[in-house]
């Protein structure tokens, strides 16, 4: 016989199955949820670990394979040492150490950015005792580098007594690609820095390409670090600098050698002014305390660690200062500043 009460009880059981009654917990579901959460947590940690490992391996691979593949560089670094000493004095152990530190610094920078590294030694050549012709030979070395690397466009001369403080900066990003924004063409303008008091001359065309990039210090043109571009203009300048007649007549009158020569040509030749561009000295030729005597702490000239100056030039360290002590000081500053990068191998 049909019983409505039993039917209601059966229907109630059917509706509640397999869900728990209100106010009760499902122990089985709780255990399964905990297991799933633990599984997903372990899986996520494992995936994160694999991702970090792959990232580090990729960085290492890029640094040591793709980024170091040989390529035809557009830049040549010209660096001159003096293996045999010279006519002025005998080379001491401290001078050897200075040369070793400076050479290693430049070589690492060239390797980092894929630049050609053109090293020349002045050697023990016969010279007159009253001459210091190594400076005049800059023109020869630049022309020799141009012949050796016929496809390169820019040639960076950098003195022995310099130290690159921020090697992560390429010359392209630092200077070459920004010339339109950072270079001054006419330093005779009243608003520009003009320590030699040059005057305007006619027929100068500042719309021509820049072929010579340099800075000025308290005494005039600074040639411890400068850039020249391969061009007919540069070939003409090199010929002027090494002309035997000019050298024979003027080398005793110009105590600063090629610096005085270029200043003389700049003062009197419109074609030379048309191809030159001046950048702030500290852009790639900062001075240490002691250089530019009488200037105190003029921010125009002197190295500023906080602002990350690219290179320090120990100008004049051979006169009353210690070149080795100074280059070791700046080497230590650079190492401390970049120490954290050693934690990540591909930086």
From Swiss-Prot:
Pfam families: Glyco_transf_34. Its main location: endoplasmic reticulum. It is found in: Endoplasmic reticulum membrane. Its EC number is 2.4.1.-. The keyword tRNA processing does not apply. It comes from the Eukaryota. GO terms for cellular component: endoplasmic reticulum membrane; Golgi apparatus; Golgi membrane. It is an enzyme of class 2 (transferase). Belongs to the glycosyltransferase 34 family. This is Uncharacterized alpha-1,2-galactosyltransferase C637.06.
């Amino acid at each position: 016989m049909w019983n409505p009460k039993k039917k209601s009880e059966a229907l109630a059981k059917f509706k509640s199955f397999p869900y728990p009654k209100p106010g009760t917990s499902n122990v089985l579901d709780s255990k399964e949820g905990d297991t799933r959460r633990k599984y997903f947590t372990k899986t996520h940690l494992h995936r994160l670990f694999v991702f970090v490992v792959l990232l580090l391996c990729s960085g290492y691979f890029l640094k040591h394979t793709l980024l170091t593949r040989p390529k035809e560089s557009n830049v040549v670094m010209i660096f001159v040492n003096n293996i045999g000493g010279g006519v002025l004095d005998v080379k001491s152990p401290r001078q050897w150490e200075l040369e070793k530190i400076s050479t290693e610094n430049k070589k690492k920078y060239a390797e980092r950015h894929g630049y050609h590294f053109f090293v020349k030694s002045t050697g023990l050549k016969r010279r007159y005792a009253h001459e210091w012709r190594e400076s005049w030979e800059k023109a020869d070395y630049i022309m020799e580098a141009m012949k050796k690397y016929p496809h390169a466009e820019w040639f960076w001369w950098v003195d022995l007594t310099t130290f690159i403080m921020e090697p992560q900066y390429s010359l392209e990003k630092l200077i070459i690609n920004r010339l339109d924004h950072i270079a001054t063409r006419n330093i005779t303008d009243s608003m520009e820095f003009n320590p030699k008091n040059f005057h305007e001359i006619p027929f100068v065309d500042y719309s021509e390409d820049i072929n010579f990039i340099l800075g000025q210090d308290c005494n005039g043109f600074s040639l411890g670090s400068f850039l020249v571009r391969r061009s007919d203009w540069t070939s003409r300048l090199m010929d002027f600098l090494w002309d035997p007649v000019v050298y024979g007549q003027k080398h005793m009158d110009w105590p600063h050698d090629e610096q005085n020569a270029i200043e003389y040509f700049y003062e009197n030749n419109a074609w030379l002014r048309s191809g030159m561009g001046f950048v702030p000295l500290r852009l790639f030729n900062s001075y240490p305390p002691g250089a530019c005597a009488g200037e105190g702490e003029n921010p125009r000239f002197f190295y500023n660690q906080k602002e990350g100056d690219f290179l320090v030039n120990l100008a004049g360290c051979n006169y009353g200062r210690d070149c080795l002590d100074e280059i070791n000081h700046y080497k230590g500053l650079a190492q401390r500043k970049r120490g954290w990068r050693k934690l990540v191998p591909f930086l």
